[in-house]
Swiss-Prot record:
Name by which UniProt lists this protein: D-alanine--D-alanine ligase
Gene: ddl
PANTHER family for the chain: D-ALANINE--D-ALANINE LIGASE (PTHR23132), D-ALANINE--D-ALANINE LIGASE A (PTHR23132:SF25)
Pathway terms, separated by semicolons: Cell wall biogenesis; peptidoglycan biosynthesis
Catalysed reactions listed for this entry: 2 D-alanine + ATP = D-alanyl-D-alanine + ADP + phosphate + H(+)
């Protein structure tokens, strides 16, 4: 039987491009090469599409995907040239211009099946403020917050923050992930610096109440019939789970499954599945919770293209459920084809 083509898109224009490369390299090594052949395209910081490597068999352990430092610009293509009949695209892209609906819309115009959420759910989940408002309507508990938009009266918003919240608070760009641009503030001076940082990444910013809590994550897989994993816990050796702690310094470990009461496990899985449905999720997501010292459970965010490295929480959660990394990839390809068929059938 002829192999099916799996196309990996990686890199991208967002600040999370390095995570994307790590995730794509993990996928490239884990693919079942009896079933798939792999073709890769690097998207540069400027948005150029570069044809990079092809694999018919599992690459060597030291094989690296080409990046800005190693790509051959003579291999630059028109973005639409990635089209191949029968291929499925795995957009292993994180952050803006990757998991915000942009690339998903492009792939739908090309009439190509792709792994993950569609335009609407990607866009909704990428924006933290919009996500909170959707989840509020679904009755899912979240930490108190204040939303800011560039151009609003900053002094008035700082006053609102200090009236509604108590220090410490966390300031986040609304449209970023992987803890990029997020910082903790213990006083107004630090808050002002945090707002300056967050507004460098987005014109919409979220300030959330800091809570003393454990960070618990649940994996989601499916389209209409979504399944969830047992929760896993992020165990940190740092005060704040930032980008460097996650991907560079290796200062975190995972406890899978998390050691939490059964009733909390049930609530988290129920809320994760409800959030996925409320946002119109497809394929995969990772739902992140705060489990506070007083027993309260808050949904923090739903990540529609979670980190996919071999040490990332999402594939490890499914491995704990008995679904291996290669089988997880194969399942995601099947879900992509199912979603594509339904999407095309709706175009009457």
């Amino acid at each position: 039987m002829a192999k099916q083509r799996l196309i990996l898109l990686y890199g991208g224009r967002s600040a999370e491009r390095e995570v994307s490369v790590l995730s794509a390299e993990s996928v490239m090594r884990a693919v079942n090469y009896d079933r798939f052949s792999v073709k890769t395209y690097f998207i540069t910081k400027d948005g150029d599409f570069i044809q990079t490597q092809e694999f018919e068999a599992k690459p060597a352990a030291d094989e690296k995907l080409m990046t800005n430092a190693t790509v051959d610009m003579s291999q630059k293509i028109k973005p639409s040239d990635i089209y191949e009949d029968g291929a499925v695209v795995f957009p292993v892209l994180h952050g803006p211009m990757g998991e915000d609906g942009s690339i998903q819309g492009f792939l739908e115009v090309l009439k190509m099946p792709y792994v993950g959420c569609n335009i609407l759910s990607s866009g909704l989940a990428m924006d933290k403020i919009t996500t909170k408002r959707v989840l509020e309507s679904a009755g899912i508990a979240q930490v108190p917050y204040v939303a800011l938009v560039d151009g609003e009266d900053l002094e008035q918003k700082i006053q609102e923050i200090e009236e509604k919240l108590t220090y410490p608070v966390f300031t986040k760009p609304s449209n970023m992930g992987s803890s990029v641009g997020i910082s903790k503030s213990e006083n107004q001076a630090e808050l002002r610096a945090s707002l300056d940082l967050a507004f460098k990444y987005d014109s919409r910013v979220l300030v959330e109440q800091g809570v003393t809590a454990r960070e618990i994550e649940v994996g989601l897989l499916g389209n209409v019939d979504v399944k969830s994993t047992l929760p896993g816990e992020v165990v940190k050796d740092v005060a704040f789970y930032d980008y460097e702690a996650k991907y560079i310094d290796n200062k975190i470990t995972m406890d899978i499954p998390a050691k939490i009461p059964e009733e909390v496990v049930s609530l988290m899985r129920q809320n994760a599945e409800a959030a996925f449905r409320a946002l119109g999720g497809l394929g995969l997501s990772r739902c992140d919770f705060f489990y506070a010292e007083d027993g309260q459970v808050f949904l923090n965010e739903l990540n529609t293209m979670p980190g996919f490295t071999q040490w990332s929480m999402y594939p490890l959660l499914w491995e704990n459920m008995g679904l291996s990394y290669p089988d997880l990839i194969e399942k995601l390809v099947g879900l992509a084809e199912e979603a594509f068929a339904k999407r095309e059938a709706h175009l009457l």
